[in-house]
Amino acid sequence: MQRFIKWLAVITSLDLLVVLLGGALVTKTGSGQGCGKSWPLCNGEFVPSNLSMETIIELSHRLTSGSAGILVTLLCILSWKYYKHVRETKTLAILSFVFLVAQALMGAAAVVWGQMPAVLAIHFGISLISFASVILLTCLIFEIDQKFDARSLIMDKKMKFHIYGVTIYSYIVVYTGALVRHERATLACPDFPLCSKSRPMPTQLHEWVQMGHRVAAMLIFAWILYAMIIAIRHYKQQRVVYWGWIISFILVTLQAIVGILVVFTNASLAMALLHSLFISCLFAVLCYLVMIGTRSTVNAKETESTSKQTK
């Protein structure tokens, strides 16, 4: 059964990643109304008779979301049953399921009633939490923490501050990026790093949205770089922290490069999807560091309690 659960966890993680990228594809191609205002049917039909490209994209996104719902539900039930001895299992199972349902309902509401761009941006963020929760659940199932000796890890308050702070801030950056997409402000500023050569500062809403995201992205790049330097200097023996920040920096660097290329390639589809892919992976890595950080707090308390009993 454990072998089956491992395969299920991998397939579920990949399916949720496809859902995330599919949502970005729907937004990028303007396929949100590919099935009209009909849900769960498509243009009022179970199998639509008129298959335009927008309809195929929207319908494919709905199908992958539906399959993800089934897989996540099954994974949550089995992990709850067979891995309940691991402290985080129940919490992650609940988060995976609840946020998947929430993003499905928001997606349906957006189709039927329409939503403001600011609300639609939350849709991607909710999907991201469900994806990260399933990734962490998969890591627990594969016992990644044991391979990195994460169960005995103890971090200082400074490192935990950076982990929690960067993760929370990354979610804000994700929201600003999703807002850029839904406000259709991707090409509002045709130059980089300033808005344009003739007009370096933004003057209207779409330019402010775009430049706001750029500033937020630059700050998270600098913050992750700083945290990585601390990890390299002081956590070389703690492999999960050491490599966690190095991987995070690689991902945020790739994210920044692709973000710049989005501007200079006239928002090509490939660059837009890579932009969503890298931020999804980065957020999952940061969430894993958060989980390790909470374990560090527990480990520190247990060590302190043991030392007191010894005395």
Swiss-Prot record:
Molecular-function GO terms, alphabetical: metal ion binding; oxidoreductase activity, acting on NAD(P)H, heme protein as acceptor
Entry binding sites for heme o: 61, 123
Subcellular location: Cell membrane
Binding site for heme b: 213, 275
Membrane topology field: Multi-pass membrane protein
Disulfide bonds, paired cysteine numbers: 35-42, 189-195
Pathway it works in: Porphyrin-containing compound metabolism; heme A biosynthesis; heme A from heme O: step 1/1
One Pfam family here: COX15-CtaA
Protein name: Heme A synthase
EC number annotated for this UniProt entry: 1.17.99.9
Record field: transmembrane: 7-27, 63-83, 92-112, 122-142, 160-180, 212-232, 244-264, 272-292
UniProt keyword annotation of ATP-binding present: no
Organism for this UniProt entry: Bacillus mycoides (strain KBAB4)
Main location: membrane
Protein family according to the UniProt entry: Belongs to the COX15/CtaA family. Type 1 subfamily.
List of catalytic residues: 58
Cytoplasmic side: 1-6, 84-91, 143-159, 233-243, 293-311
Reactions this protein catalyses: Fe(II)-heme o + 2 A + H2O = Fe(II)-heme a + 2 AH2
Role played: Catalyzes the conversion of heme O to heme A by two successive hydroxylations of the methyl group at C8. The first hydroxylation forms heme I, the second hydroxylation results in an unstable dihydroxymethyl group, which spontaneously dehydrates, resulting in the formyl group of heme A.
Enzymatic class: oxidoreductase
Extracellular side stretches: 28-62, 113-121, 181-211, 265-271
Complex and partners: Interacts with CtaB.
Free-text note on domains in this protein's UniProt record: The N-half (TM1-TM4) and C-half (TM5-TM8) domains are connected by an intracellular loop. Each domain is formed from four-helix bundles and they align in a pseudo twofold symmetry manner. The N-half domain is the substrate-heme O binding domain and the C-half domain is the cofactor heme B binding domain. The cysteines of disulfide bond Cys-35 and Cys-42 may be involved in transfer of reducing equivalents from quinol in the membrane to the active site of the enzyme.
Phylogenetic classification of the source organism: Bacteria, Bacillati, Bacillota, Bacilli, Bacillales
